[in-house]
Amino acid sequence: AKGERRPEKQLHHERILMFSEGRSYYYTFKPVIDAFLRRGVPFSYITMDVEDPALTIENDLMNSRYIGTGSAAFARAAGRRADIMLSTTPNIGTPGFPMPRPRRVTNLAHICHGVGDIAMYQKGSLDHYDAVLMVGDFMLPSIRKVEELRGLPPKECVSLGLPYLDELAAKARKKEGRSTPPVVLVAPSWGNKGCLNICGPNFLLDLAKAGYDVILRPHPQSLKVETEMLDTIHEMLRDYPNVSFDTEMDATASMSRADVMISDKSCVRFDFAFLYEKPVITLDIPVRNPELYEVADLGVIWEDTVAARLGEVVSPEDFNNIVPVVERALKTPSSAIAAFREESVACWGRSGEAIAQWTVDTLARMDAEHAAEAAATKTK
């Protein structure tokens, strides 16, 4: 049954251990889980979320376990013994984070869960990892620079893509051509870094008056903490039948309809552009508290350097005259976005399989090294 604490098979030592903080990361782990099961590879899966859909998977190859929440769960995860631990969790082992680097895990490997380099990771987030399964080769310079600055040994870095995009690409329905009128999807971040707060909502009114089919998809957190602002926007736009609000958990329906997206620094920009080969208008805003992030040492954020390849990059002032910006963005050729995706994201559509292959190959390499060491000891 869903969320049931199933009896754990008492494995003294696990070869492969997947550690998840919860259901938000299910689509990141699912393609890897599927690949292990297809290959007949046994593994363990631990999660801090009793509602994690992975707990409902019934397969003798998968030893899954709910380990609780909070600091106690992090301690349980850190106490496991494994050859390889696959985790999306940054900050493991950093001062102040509740999970120390697991001492009895030989290879701690990070799976990425968004398109971007490490500039907007908190400082030291990946310092205690042994391997980074990168989205693409573009991540390598920033990882190596941080290692060099801190005198860290070089991690194994291999470009294996983004598994959750496997899952989304399988569901994506790309439409041919452009709708009439064009569909504009507005997907802001929440809080003071979002385009609605920085630019105000009047640009939505301008889009509605211009006759575009406008979809506003608030961030899920906005639905919890910014209800007053959203109520004001509802009231402002209630007389425009060409404006709709999308509060569904799954963004697929809105994304598949849209011809262009307006956003800020949200990673959803890359998901939309790469999945649907449609342009994005990015609001260029400075990073708040950059000293907390790796950008303080790197000096540059990869996502900022490439945002123009998704479409248009604009200032808050440009939102006062948003219609010409939309018209320019709509001229961005799909072929250019597809080419950018191909050069940025490795193993498109088969990342889960690639990560499973890397894991199996790494175990084989570890076994060979152990055998060689044992043979060398025996001949002494």
Tell me what each language-model feature is.
Residues 69-77, 228-270, 275:
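Donor nucleotide-activated moiety binding/catalytic core segment of transferases
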Residues 86-87, 110, 134, 186, ...:
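Redox-cofactor binding/interface segments in oxidoreductases and associated redox assembly factors
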Residues 25-41, 163-234, 316-319, 330, ...:
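Conserved catalytic-core segment of nucleotide-activated headgroup transferases in glycan assembly
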Residues 154, 267-343:
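Catalytic binding pocket for nucleotide-activated donors in carbohydrate/polymer assembly enzymes
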Residues 14-169:
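Active-site and donor-binding regions of nucleotide-sugar-utilizing enzymes
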Residues 2, 308, 314-380:
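C-terminal amphipathic helix plus adjacent low-complexity
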Residues 2-23, 186:
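Nucleotide-activated donor-dependent transferases that construct or modify glycoconjugates
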Residues 64-73, 244-247, 309-319:
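Short acidic-hydrophobic, aromatic-tinged amphipathic segments that line or gate anion-handling sites
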